[in-house]
Amino acid sequence: MARKKKEEAQQTRQQLIEAAIGQFATRGVASTTLTDIADAAKVTRGAIYWHFTSKSEIFNAIWEQQLPLRDIIHDRLSLSDSDDPLLKLREQFITALQHIAHEPRQCALLQILYHKCEFSSDMISEREIRKRIGFNDDTLRSALETCISRNIISPQVNVDLTLIVFHGFFSGIIKNWLMNNDSFNLYQQAPALVDSILATLPVIRVSPDEGAYCSAPGNISPRAQSASMVCALTGLPNR
């Protein structure tokens, strides 16, 4: 009996968190009341206070349980550590954008982060949330350094500056799409968007591994992908 009550309590807590995500994304954090959350979760306001002391505590609980995007998409990736690191990075970026476009919960979370929240001192900071849910800078840095060591991109690339550029590009794309998701199809255009971003890197070698990507519909060979990036950078035609 005690175990059942504990499970029911945990279920109610999660109901409140999911309801809060929906309400925050729609109304904004500041405009959402505890009553709004209780009504959306179909529980009493008293049930909220059994689990949370304030709206800020619910907000913090949302992000504390959120997995990093890199972990969420891990099982969807086809390339391994032995494959071309630039193409692996490309696949991760594309899959991440497509996940955001396809999953309403992920979309709602980012809507809250980018457009529906004014942070206060009792809330997890925007910086901490970004660090918690995004791609790890050390992982991206390692991927770029591997590309340099394997002569895929120029050794003159400033890795730290490139990370700043990547963050700016992806934040801008996601923010603009969230403001008006009818303005472009993020899911369909994710490959072209990522290729345009990676085209800022001076690629100096075309990967010889034509088998890096599987033959599923929509996949492009590594040679064609790398050639596309080089052509986008130089302005030369892609023949």
Task: Name what the model sees in each region.
Residues 24, 33-34, 45, 55, ...:
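Amphipathic alpha-helical segments enriched in hydrophobic/aromatic and basic residues
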Residues 88, 101-130, 209, 213-214:
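Amphipathic alpha-helical segments used for helix-helix packing
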Residues 1-27, 31-43, 56-57:
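Basic, helix-initiating cap at the start of DNA-binding domains
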Residues 1-11, 207-239:
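N-terminal intrinsically disordered/low-complexity leader segments
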Residues 71, 75-76, 83, 87, ...:
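Amphipathic alpha-helical packing segments from all-alpha helical-bundle domains
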Residues 99-102, 115, 119, 142, ...:
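Amphipathic C-terminal alpha-helical segment
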Residues 61, 75-106, 159-166, 206-207, ...:
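Hydrophobic alpha-helical connector segments
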